[in-house]
Design a protein with these regions (language model features):
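Rhodanese-like catalytic fold shared by cysteine-dependent sulfurtransferases
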Residues: 21-137, 159-200, 207-277
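Internal active-site segments that recognize and position negatively charged phosphoryl groups
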Residues: 142-163
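Coiled-coil-like amphipathic alpha-helices with heptad-repeat character
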Residues: 2-5, 17-18
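Short, Lys/Arg-enriched N-terminal segments with co-localized hydrophobic residues
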Residues: 12-23
Length: 277
């Protein structure tokens, strides 16, 4: 009388595994900090070893001015790596102000692990600019709407043009750059420290607009603001009904773009299937 039971049990078990696999997520950490790392080349091997030991993939950049990158893995692995970066012996307290944004991915968004050595963690090609010494005023996501709604504030998107096409803030100027090192040319053509008294800048995770703020201050601009944590922090913090963001935020991994709540585009589309407008 139990002849049919094993077959039914196997079917239930198999479908349960498929459902579980679909629901498994990877934790993604976007991180950066401008910090003096004169020994950056010596940090590459132990950082690779640390990430590999916890099954982490992604890309991290090390330079004399700090660290930048995005990594992904299971939650325990990401948490262990972040703990070592911020409080462990490897960086000896030099990354205790690490800027972090966490999101999830329905599948591993990176194929491999890379730790690269660079002259700059974000390339501006302006050696006189030192964000470890001087940057603009950080603006929290909760205060961003009020700032960029001020008609006296010039809002600047510091990202490249293909990113801007996917989404940006209302009133934002598009520098139409192909790479960040072209941003100073945009400034010299478009902005004037004598006329443009207040500049508010933003980028994906905060690193480009932070370095851009240091550049503008060096060029004589007096009131320079930048979105702390970038667009990702804004989308994580601000509900859609209060948002001034238009479109999606491009990210440099296989998820391609994120929306409010840092939901990846494909997942958002799947969840909306069958809904009436």
């Amino acid at each position: 009388m139990f002849r049919g039971s094993p077959r039914h049990s196997r079917i239930f078990f198999s479908s349960d595994i498929v459902l579980l696999a679909r629901r498994m997520t990877h934790k993604v950490a976007a991180l950066y900090q401008f910090a003096a790392l004169p020994d950056f080349s010596d940090l590459r091997a132990p950082l690779l070893e640390l990430c590999a030991a916890h099954g982490i993939r992604g890309t991290l950049l090390l330079s004399p001015e700090g660290i930048n990158g995005t990594i992904a893995g299971l939650e325990d692995g990401i948490d262990a790596v972040i703990a070592e970066l911020t409080t462990g012996a490897l960086f000896a307290g030099r990354l205790n102000n690490l800027e972090l944004k966490f999101s999830t991915a329905s599948a591993m968004p990176f194929k491999r692990l890379k730790v690269r050595l660079k002259k700059e963690i974000v390339t501006l090609l302006q050696p006189q600019v030192d964000p470890t010494r001087q940057v603009g005023t950080y603006v929290a996501a909760e205060d961003w709407n009020a700032l960029i709604s001020d008609p006296d504030v010039i809002v600047v998107d510091t990202r490249n043009r293909f990113e801007v096409k996917m989404g940006t803030f209302e009133r934002a100027l598009d520098p139409e750059t192909r790479k960040f090192s072209q941003f100073p040319d945009f400034v010299s053509r478009t902005l004037n420290p004598d006329k443009n008294k207040k500049i508010a800048m933003f980028c994906t995770g905060g690193i480009r607009c932070e370095k851009a703020s240091a550049y503008l201050l060096a060029e004589g601009f007096a009131e320079v603001f930048h979105l702390k944590g970038g667009i990702l922090k804004y989308l994580e913090t601000i509900p859609p009904e209060q948002s001034l963001w238009q479109g999606e935020c491009f990210v440099f991994d296989e998820r391609v773009a994120l929306g409010h709540g840092l939901v990846e585009r494909a997942l958002a589309e799947d969840e909306s299937e069958g809904e009436t407008p």
